[in-house]
Amino acid sequence: MAPKKAKKRAGGANSNVFSMFEQTQIQEFKEAFTIMDQNRDGFIDKNDLRDTFAALGRVNVKNEEIDEMIKEAPGPINFTVFLTMFGEKLKGADPEETILNAFKVFDPEGKGVLKADYVREMLTTQAERFSKEEVDQMFAAFPPDVTGNLDYKNLVHIITHGEEKD
């Protein structure tokens, strides 16, 4: 009976961390974990991190740097611990700041506005592409100004707070 109880506790912990992410995200984390678990023992240790860095071209990583990474974990880093660590890091991320930073990549001068045509092109041709209808809906809800600029700072504020900035 005791092993079943232990298993239930582990299962409960798993269900909490696994509910933080969508299934596709969990699969992506699993792929990253598998790549980092160089010796395929189900745990990421110092040697795995060193080998991962080497595979990425960083061969002179200091022991202290690797030790600091390992210390972030509460114990041996299996997949559940790995997922929990990422969940805790992502949980603290401010959604408004995250979205603003994504727009700022395209606004190196920091004006707070982008040409609507450029935004439309980026949304329909890059990464997880929006459909024409989705972009049309966005511009219907957040129309560009008379000069064709989209005030992305205000857009992000409305997305994250549900109201316009004063």
UniProtKB/Swiss-Prot annotation:
It is linked to Cardiomyopathy, familial hypertrophic, 10: A hereditary heart disorder characterized by ventricular hypertrophy, which is usually asymmetric and often involves the interventricular septum. The symptoms include dyspnea, syncope, collapse, palpitations, and chest pain. They can be readily provoked by exercise. The disorder has inter- and intrafamilial variability ranging from benign to malignant forms with high risk of cardiac failure and sudden cardiac death. Rarely, patients present a variant of familial hypertrophic cardiomyopathy, characterized by mid-left ventricular chamber thickening. Myopathy, myofibrillar, 12, infantile-onset, with cardiomyopathy: A form of myofibrillar myopathy, a group of chronic neuromuscular disorders characterized at ultrastructural level by disintegration of the sarcomeric Z disk and myofibrils, and replacement of the normal myofibrillar markings by small dense granules, or larger hyaline masses, or amorphous material. MFM12 is an autosomal recessive, severe form characterized by progressive myopathy with onset shortly after birth, tremor or clonus at birth, and cardiomyopathy usually leading to death by 6 months of age. N-terminus is methylated by METTL11A/NTM1. Phosphorylated by MYLK3 and MYLK2; promotes cardiac muscle contraction and function. Dephosphorylated by PPP1CB complexed to PPP1R12B. The phosphorylated form in adult is expressed as gradients across the heart from endocardium (low phosphorylation) to epicardium (high phosphorylation); regulates cardiac torsion and workload distribution. This is Myosin regulatory light chain 2, ventricular/cardiac muscle isoform. Residues 24-59, 94-129, 130-165 form the EF-hand domain. Ca(2+) binds at residues 37, 39, 41, 48. GO terms for molecular function: actin monomer binding; calcium ion binding; myosin heavy chain binding; structural constituent of muscle. It holds the Pfam family EF-hand_7. The lineage of its organism: Eukaryota, Metazoa, Chordata, Craniata, Vertebrata. This chain binds calcium. The keyword rRNA-binding does not apply. It comes from Homo sapiens (Human). PANTHER family: MYOSIN REGULATORY LIGHT CHAIN 2. It is found in: Cytoplasm, Myofibril, Sarcomere, A band. Changing residue 58 to Q: In CMH10; impairs calcium binding; bind calcium upon phosphorylation. SUPFAM superfamilies: EF-hand. Changing residue 18 to L: In CMH10; decrease calcium binding affinity. Changing residue 95 to A: In CMH10; with mid-left ventricular chamber thickening; decrease calcium binding affinity. Contractile protein that plays a role in heart development and function. Following phosphorylation, plays a role in cross-bridge cycling kinetics and cardiac muscle contraction by increasing myosin lever arm stiffness and promoting myosin head diffusion; as a consequence of the increase in maximum contraction force and calcium sensitivity of contraction force. Myosin is a hexamer of 2 heavy chains and 4 light chains. Interacts with MYOC. GO terms for biological process: cardiac muscle contraction; cardiac myofibril assembly; heart contraction; heart development; muscle cell fate specification; negative regulation of cell growth; positive regulation of the force of heart contraction; post-embryonic development. Transmembrane segments: none annotated. Keywords: Calcium, Cardiomyopathy, Cytoplasm, Disease variant, Metal-binding, Methylation, Motor protein, Muscle protein, Myofibrillar myopathy, Myosin, Phosphoprotein, Repeat. One of its GO terms (cellular component) is cytoplasm. The modification N,N,N-trimethylalanine is found at residue 2. Highly expressed in type I muscle fibers.
